[in-house]
Amino acid sequence: MSAGGRDEERRKLADIIHHWNANRLDLFEISQPTEDLEFHGVMRFYFQDKAAGNFATKCIRVSSTATTQDVIETLAEKFRPDMRMLSSPKYSLYEVHVSGERRLDIDEKPLVVQLNWNKDDREGRFVLKNENDAIPPKKAQSNGPEKQEKEGVIQNFKRTLSKKEKKEKKKREKEALRQASDKDDRPFQGEDVENSRLAAEVYKDMPETSFTRTISNPEVVMKRRRQQKLEKRMQEFRSSDGRPDSGGTLRIYADSLKPNIPYKTILLSTTDPADFAVAEALEKYGLEKENPKDYCIARVMLPPGAQHSDEKGAKEIILDDDECPLQIFREWPSDKGILVFQLKRRPPDHIPKKTKKHLEGKTPKGKERADGSGYGSTLPPEKLPYLVELSPGRRNHFAYYNYHTYEDGSDSRDKPKLYRLQLSVTEVGTEKLDDNSIQLFGPGIQPHHCDLTNMDGVVTVTPRSMDAETYVEGQRISETTMLQSGMKVQFGASHVFKFVDPSQDHALAKRSVDGGLMVKGPRHKPGIVQETTFDLGGDIHSGTALPTSKSTTRLDSDRVSSASSTAERGMVKPMIRVEQQPDYRRQESRTQDASGPELILPASIEFRESSEDSFLSAIINYTNSSTVHFKLSPTYVLYMACRYVLSNQYRPDISPTERTHKVIAVVNKMVSMMEGVIQKQKNIAGALAFWMANASELLNFIKQDRDLSRITLDAQDVLAHLVQMAFKYLVHCLQSELNNYMPAFLDDPEENSLQRPKIDDVLHTLTGAMSLLRRCRVNAALTIQLFSQLFHFINMWLFNRLVTDPDSGLCSHYWGAIIRQQLGHIEAWAEKQGLELAADCHLSRIVQATTLLTMDKYAPDDIPNINSTCFKLNSLQLQALLQNYHCAPDEPFIPTDLIENVVTVAENTADELARSDGREVQLEEDPDLQLPFLLPEDGYSCDVVRNIPNGLQEFLDPLCQRGFCRLIPHTRSPGTWTIYFEGADYESHLLRENTELAQPLRKEPEIITVTLKKQNGMGLSIVAAKGAGQDKLGIYVKSVVKGGAADVDGRLAAGDQLLSVDGRSLVGLSQERAAELMTRTSSVVTLEVAKQGAIYHGLATLLNQPSPMMQRISDRRGSGKPRPKSEGFELYNNSTQNGSPESPQLPWAEYSEPKKLPGDDRLMKNRADHRSSPNVANQPPSPGGKSAYASGTTAKITSVSTGNLCTEEQTPPPRPEAYPIPTQTYTREYFTFPASKSQDRMAPPQNQWPNYEEKPHMHTDSNHSSIAIQRVTRSQEELREDKAYQLERHRIEAAMDRKSDSDMWINQSSSLDSSTSSQEHLNHSSKSVTPASTLTKSGPGRWKTPAAIPATPVAVSQPIRTDLPPPPPPPPVHYAGDFDGMSMDLPLPPPPSANQIGLPSAQVAAAERRKREEHQRWYEKEKARLEEERERKRREQERKLGQMRTQSLNPAPFSPLTAQQMKPEKPSTLQRPQETVIRELQPQQQPRTIERRDLQYITVSKEELSSGDSLSPDPWKRDAKEKLEKQQQMHIVDMLSKEIQELQSKPDRSAEESDRLRKLMLEWQFQKRLQESKQKDEDDEEEEDDDVDTMLIMQRLEAERRARLQDEERRRQQQLEEMRKREAEDRARQEEERRRQEEERTKRDAEEKRRQEEGYYSRLEAERRRQHDEAARRLLEPEAPGLCRPPLPRDYEPPSPSPAPGAPPPPPQRNASYLKTQVLSPDSLFTAKFVAYNEEEEEEDCSLAGPNSYPGSTGAAVGAHDACRDAKEKRSKSQDADSPGSSGAPENLTFKERQRLFSQGQDVSNKVKASRKLTELENELNTK
């Protein structure tokens, strides 16, 4: 026997022994089997002393290997019956039960025989008998020839019996004689007399007592066992269909066999045939040894009122073996008399009716009406033909049946009705003529409509009148028509049925069976085989409705062939178990038209047996966890493989037992491979999480599967162990990672060391872990346990450092506050993740320790407070903390008596508690968290995943291509993966399918009109999707934001479809367009709403899922799975704050998980959605960006938040993934809607501005943006790769360095932050900066507390929509923004246009040349126009300073200012107002609160903020900034070099080209000098000095340059003079003309915009877009990152041109989600972030745009086209505001222009950076 087989045997044997031991007396316990399956136990043996007429008893220990012979020999010695050894006795061992005895064969094993009593909890005894003993009624107990030897030898030695004994002996002999005579009367009983004789004697002499029995409490045990057996049997009836009515009890009489027993009750199913009932009855009557073939059950019909014993008038019919007694009994009408069943010997002349019918040419499946009464429904129900209702026109049947609950349709539930056609006439009509009638109501149904006749296996339909509309296969009939299986029959106008005849189907499937089958064969419509026989062996005929199913036809025939193999109960995977047949109603109810579900898995898998090992190995051993898109793919594939092996499609020839063994072997193989892979990758966190998730999910599948669960117990144990093993390894990996950053908790804020880890690193590690677990879809309960371990580790590490290192000085108020503050970040993070309970619990000791360090502990009054606060600390810990406490210089000492008191109290409380729990009281925290590992009971993916999960097909594709396997989707499956689960509620599957998918088809949703009064937005999040059968996209409410207008109104709910807004239809519009329309509404909005349209259109699941196409570049969590529903609402987090104008200023930690939103409950159908950790249970969006909707509803979904829609969570910084699982780089379809536009337009939640208290210290990279764009559509996980993160991180850093964070914002936008909603953003960015003062008690006597350690904000990367054309801003908006958007120091040729991006550099250069002249003309024009515009702007500004709500006319509301990286010439003027902005934007002044901490980094130019701004003391930023600038500078020089080389290489240059070459050479030299100069100074400058010095250096360089230029000019003056004059005149003319045109167009456009946008669009917005676009195009080279800024609150207004330093700015505006739309349009590259800036800067910034300027970032390449037109129009409007000439890069300026600039003392070098150019222009204008 193989090792596996032996183990299996041993396990089974152990189970049996365990069962025995559980019910038997301790004395008779049996030992566990050894490796050789040997076991031992004590047995009691009796010895019958015939002479004495009594029994002796002994107990001996027996081995399972001991034979009867061995035992007899031992017993002969023990009982010593023949001490004198005068005889040669022959002993036998008998097994005696109350009902009889049996002699054991000589080689039987008595202990094994005894163990077999276990089977039916029998009690018995073993009796040693001397076969030579003479028994007076000789031969009465003869058991064989040997017994007749030497009778009476022992009598010679018989002692004299007493009178009493003689009497008893006589009595026994009489009894024996009587029994002998009985035996003659009842010959069939064979050895009964012999059997019962010894039994009677032994039980009479030794009656049942606790001494003589083995069972510990026989009555209870027997009762319990009977009960269990009964329950098990009942469970079988129930398990097949969930209802108990498929089985019950039946009385079986046996008057002729056992006249003294009235009857026996047996338990039967309605499908149990008569031969089964015979076997059961024989066993009950104690005749189990008889051959059941010799017996039969007869159905006896007694006249009504007759007694069972009355023979008169009784009609008896013997049942055929395949008839079902219980079914017959149940269907027997009481008025026809009494029906009883008799067990009797089968008459030798009996011919089964089946055979009779054969002779008459009838089908063996049809039944005779047995008693001639016309009733005759004796067929098992599943063999009767039936009608199953379909829904005409795909109308949902159950909607109709809700209304007909009183009908007799064989089903009380809302399911398709199914009517069995009995062997008689069945009337159809509105009248209920008899029990068999089919009662229907509806148009066209007559009282007696038609008759269905089932005779001789043929079913016909006959209309009763000409008015009775009856159709067969669509043809109206008027005369009797024969029905064939699969035909559709319609009664009246609306009742459509499918006729199904199992016997016909079976006949075709099994042509080789009896000849009678062939009678039906010809009548069967060709081509319907597959249609009607689909799944015959299980979910009967659920395939009949699918004649069109091409893909399943092969499977169908396979199933047909296996269908009749009832031995394979539940083994056939695609079919539902045969045991389900009893509930024919449920099953037939599935037989609907092609839209009806079929109870099978959503897909099945087939693999060749020969490639089984390769297949499993590919799935397990060679799966790279990082490249799998749907992380649970292995689980689903392996489960399908198990079901395949269980099915008859896998090796149809093998027996059920072999199949079972095969399944066990396959599962064991899977498990052992999984174990190997986990061991091999035990140090790789990503792989461990992946396999932990898969092992736990597979374990759940196997455990829950009703077939697999019983046969894979060993594998289940191993899998459970594997889950735990992977868990432990993963904990170890994560703790090791965490250990590297733990010193961050002890980071002294005053030291500010760059090398030391920051708390951010800890949070990043935790976030990476959470991201990893979510990406791998690890069960929420496991996630909680894992983080409990991590929190415990943090607690243990910190606590042990505190208490074990007294010299470290950590036990002080100062360090207590620091550690507590750092822990606050962890707690806030945990709360954000829904792990607050775990954090509270496992961080409690260190939290209490830090609280102790910072609280008052100087007077006796403090003792109670200390003990109540530090209740978790034991006496040793308290003592250590207090004794090691280092007092601050002016802090009082802790009194010794206080320490003693505190310790004493702890000894009586915490210490006692620990001891009572069995823990030692010790100083240090135990590194091991003493908690048992618990396997989750629920929350598995199978509860949530519907249909074939996205990514599963891709996972299998390589295997399918190599021929290992194939995946067969089952489109008509209900879509759930729990079909085969124990107790799975199939009805609910169907019900759910019907409610969600079919319901919409029965009627249209209710349409209502809702009028909302907006305050700050509608408060809706919308999503566009196309429902089943819909041609156009619909706009659906994804959720309602709390506190918003819609929420206040109360009528809108998630799932409602928005049909129109203010009379403008939204049907068929893209999400972007709909969002735009919705934002353009006035304060009163009228919406036309189809209530619950999503559900009516089959999109219910859409509402429960995050928008699928969105990807989070900046989100470390990676995507890859459909998330449970709760996550879908996560994005509305913070809605409470955002929704109300008076939101309080909450610390980060308070942004907790959103409460369930309206409609939430309805949508969250799954238990996995809301576990103890709301966020932990969440899973990222569906891989591949497609939601797991029910098949067929390929919903094109995008998710937009309109108006106030998008109160999004903040996203975590795009930093390198802590545990990246990089995925393959092929592009997946994240954008399934037209044009590659990203999904959601979002601004950060109003209250969650990124508070970059301390910027992450990262490195910058100038190419980030372009890389991000190129990577945009790759899978989310790929974007999580380290490199990507590095880039993201660089970008963020660069942004932060400039303190206006523009890079950061753009980074997300240009990365096409394709995530519509920040559902997944873990956001530990806006951590509250709990200052120490809040941690320590405020009041006198506080000692030095650490400076508020700013939470290093992990850059909040707000998802920014790049997919939308720039929609109008919400109404009154004044965007203040000093846009650093372009981090470019370029005096370069304008970048190429969008279509040139990415072209070879030669083409780029050519494109630049083509545009150059035009740009130069622009530059001169700009200045003049800007001056005119300036006055107008100022007037508008003054007017608007008092009008918050009419700010839309403010100039350049969202000016796309170019990177203001240059030092402004007048830093002081700029700096003051900006600081004012930062300091004074207090929440109470803001209608839309923006927290101060939020604003701190949303401000102004880099220089001002870095110069002395206390908010950014960090040199990292400077490094990053300088590095970025250096790279840009180098790039500029490279570009110049290229163009110079190009020009030099030309053999003959035109005069213009020569001039250009000269200028470029100068520029190149200048840039080189500038670079050298910067290089020299960059190491030792302070940030402020750096900025000032840089300006001075640049001025000096510029002066040198000016001198050089003048010399050059003098030398070339003669030859160039004329040319310059001509050029200048031409330019002036062209510019004048152009300016006139532009001004006219500006006015025209402005008017048009105002009308179009109802006052929301301002000319300034347009100007801003145009200008910024022009500036971008002019200033950015192709590599320039397209950078965006976070918007300032909308209501924020810039300070007036010369604001009073202390004047508080007006309240900020709220961030509207539409801002995100503007990200990558050329005119909106910088729109997503605004920065406070003053009016002068605004104007200066405006000047930089030119009509063809282009944001040369790769951003332009993506989705920019729609925006371009709009942008150009808007650009034109602001042309008059642009500054003349000065806006060009230096090499594009004419020499005169340069001279003029120099003469005015302006620094041409400032042109290198956009912001400096702006500053220069600003200054120039100010001085005019």
Curated annotation (Swiss-Prot):
This is Afadin. Residues 39-133, 246-348 form the Ras-associating domain. Its main location: other. GO terms for molecular function: actin filament binding; cadherin binding; cell adhesion molecule binding; small GTPase binding. One of its GO terms (cellular component) is nuclear speck. Belongs to an adhesion system, probably together with the E-cadherin-catenin system, which plays a role in the organization of homotypic, interneuronal and heterotypic cell-cell adherens junctions (AJs). Nectin- and actin-filament-binding protein that connects nectin to the actin cytoskeleton. May play a key role in the organization of epithelial structures of the embryonic ectoderm. Essential for the organization of adherens junctions. InterPro entries: Afadin, CBD_Afadin, Dilute_dom, FHA_dom, PDZ, PDZ_sf, RA_dom, SMAD_FHA_dom_sf. It is found in: Cell junction, Adherens junction. Residues 173-189, 349-371, 580-591, 1113-1128, 1152-1172, 1252-1262, 1274-1302, 1407-1441, 1515-1528, 1597-1677, 1762-1776, 1813-1824 have a biased composition (Basic and acidic residues). The PDZ/DHR domain interacts with the C-terminus of nectin and the Pro-rich C-terminal domain interacts with F-actin. Residues 1578-1589 have a biased composition (Acidic residues). Homodimer. Interacts with F-actin, nectin and NECTIN3. Essential for the association of nectin and E-cadherin. Isoform 1/s-afadin does not interact with F-actin. Interacts with ZO-1 and occludin, but probably in an indirect manner. Interacts with RIT1 and RIT2. Interacts with NRXN1 and BCR. Interacts with ADAM10; the interaction locks ADAM10 at adherens junctions following ADAM10 recruitment to adherens junctions by TSPAN33. The record marks D26 as: Breakpoint for translocation to form KMT2A/MLL1-AFDN. GO terms for biological process: bicellular tight junction assembly; cell adhesion; cell-cell adhesion mediated by cadherin; cell-cell signaling; establishment of endothelial intestinal barrier; establishment of protein localization to plasma membrane; negative regulation of cell migration; pore complex assembly. Residues 146-185, 1408-1448, 1523-1667 form a coiled coil. Residues 1007-1093 form the PDZ domain. It is linked to A chromosomal aberration involving AFDN is associated with acute leukemias. Translocation t(6;11)(q27;q23) with KMT2A/MLL1. The result is a rogue activator protein. The modification Phosphoserine is found at residues 216, 246, 256, 391, 424, 512, 557, 562, 589, 655, 1083, 1107, 1126, 1140, 1143, 1172-1173, 1182, 1199, 1238, 1275, 1328, 1501, 1512, 1696, 1721, 1774, 1779, 1799. The modification N6-acetyllysine is found at K1807. The keyword Magnesium does not apply. Residues 1132-1143, 1190-1210, 1325-1337 have a biased composition (Polar residues). The modification Phosphothreonine is found at T1211, T1232, T1330. Residues 160-172 have a biased composition (Basic residues). The keyword Nuclease does not apply. It comes from the Eukaryota. Residues 668-908 form the Dilute domain.
